[in-house]
């Protein structure tokens, strides 16, 4: 029995020692250290992006709208200012860290965050398939049927616009607004708004584009 136990322990130790280490694909290693407030940074860990949700994108968009950031009025997700806010949220570093970053660093951060968000649309016949199973109130979801968006009317749009205003948004072109997409998706599916705002960050562009699909306006 002692020999068997020792063999088991040895096997476990060997397995742990030889198990491949998971590489952090969101660890940005800099070509040269970036000095911020007297401290050198040789890398920036953006793994915290996995903890962000659609709500974080909504908050960032609202902040830029309220700051009257002209570039963010339409395709907010393509702007450097938007990426800065998400990167700060993901890393816990102050926003000034990203504002003062050299362009060589800033562009790499931008590329990594945009790459994270630009997942394949994977939406067919208005069925939006999720990148990973999503759990909400004890139930698992792998796809969302948005076909009923076609049944919404002008009153629904007005109600969604009023909801935007209550949430602190100035109503401009709603087709670019993340919260507006979540509101309409909720109306169409009967799922609460929180279902959509709680989706992982990388689903934000997918839901925005799916709700505004040209097929709904033919």
What positions do the PLM features span?
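C-terminal functional regions that serve as terminal interaction/effector modules
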Residues: 174-181, 188, 203-204, 208-209, ...
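Glycine-rich, flexible loop segments associated with nucleotide phosphate handling
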Residues: 72-80, 170-177
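Low-complexity, acidic/Ser/Thr- and charged residue-rich accessory regions of DNA metabolism proteins
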Residues: 2-4, 167-175, 181-183, 187
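Charged interaction scaffolds used for protein-protein
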Residues: 2-54, 59-65, 73-76, 81, ...
